[in-house]
């Protein structure tokens, strides 16, 4: 196994996670009620970690002829191992941001170390559910310190964390590794080994003359459809801007995360349901 090749690909994948983290950090600072201190704790730490670890792995292999040394075994190892750091980075905002019991909650008299450990497991589950578009959630009154009796548990979370939750599903819908292919196929050439490891369904012969061209086209379509759905939900379904953005992100990926405990039922709108059904297909 050529571990420097695997490390290079993992480094690129990890660095890509920093971009959506920067988006939610900016949202938290300027539009969310939690402010700068919360943004630094929940997002800046994983953002710096993603950038530093990713850059370190890429730098270790710099100068090596990665393209000619990339074989199927390195590609399969990269895809399999790539999910681990991606999910860990995705879990940190939940754990550090207080969706589940984390280090910040240790100052509470009723919180034990075992609660913080359970919070880490819950955060991992929520992140994995998002990136794999499973749609299961463990955010409830028993697991989240932000939920109070009689409150809507999910909507009680900071908006930036709800947005991060939706972004994990949107990225997972197309495949976070596929996003890496878009860059790596240009940087390395010969991204077909990675494609064989990540993609299922259509044969590679039908993916088009260039993997990079195919990946760019798929992501362009994905982004355009997301924007169209968001606008339809906002102006035809008369959904609020924040809700329309989140449901567009999670519907197109067929993930199912919502912005409240009741999900779509909270809107009680046939127009919204029709729009969502169309884009879920």
Residue ranges of predicted features:
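Membrane-proximal intracellular helices of multi-pass ion channels
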Residues: 1-281
């Amino acid at each position: 196994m050529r571990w420097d090749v695997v490390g290079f690909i993992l480094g690129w994948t990890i660095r890509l996670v920093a971009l959506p983290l920067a988006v939610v950090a900016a949202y938290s600072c300027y539009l969310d009620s939690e402010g700068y201190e919360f943004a630094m704790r929940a997002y800046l730490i994983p953002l710096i970690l993603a950038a530093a670890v990713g850059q370190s792995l890429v730098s270790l292999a710099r100068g090596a002829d990665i393209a000619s040394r990339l074989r199927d075994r390195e590609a399969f190892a990269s895809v399999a191992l790539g999910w681990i750091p991606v999910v860990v980075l995705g879990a940190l905002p939940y754990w550090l941001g207080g969706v589940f019991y984390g280090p910040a909650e240790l100052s509470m008299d009723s919180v034990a170390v075992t609660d913080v450990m359970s919070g880490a497991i819950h955060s991992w589950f929520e992140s994995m559910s998002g990136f794999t578009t499973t749609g299961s959630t463990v955010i409830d009154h028993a697991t989240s310190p932000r939920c109070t009796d009689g409150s809507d548990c999910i909507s009680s979370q900071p908006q930036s964390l709800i947005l991060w939750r939706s972004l994990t599903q949107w990225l997972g819908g197309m495949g976070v590794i596929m996003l890496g292919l878009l860059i790596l196929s240009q940087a390395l050439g010969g991204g077909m080994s990675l494609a064989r490891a990540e993609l299922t369904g259509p044969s590679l012969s039908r993916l088009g003359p260039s993997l990079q061209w195919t990946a760019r086209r798929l992501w362009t379509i994905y982004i355009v459809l997301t924007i169209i759905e968001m606008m339809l939900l906002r102006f035809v379904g008369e959904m609020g801007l924040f809700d329309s953005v989140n449901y567009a992100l999670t519907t197109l990926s067929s993930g199912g995360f919502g912005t409240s405990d009741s999900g779509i039922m909270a809107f009680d709108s046939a127009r919204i349901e029709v729009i969502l059904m169309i884009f879920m297909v």
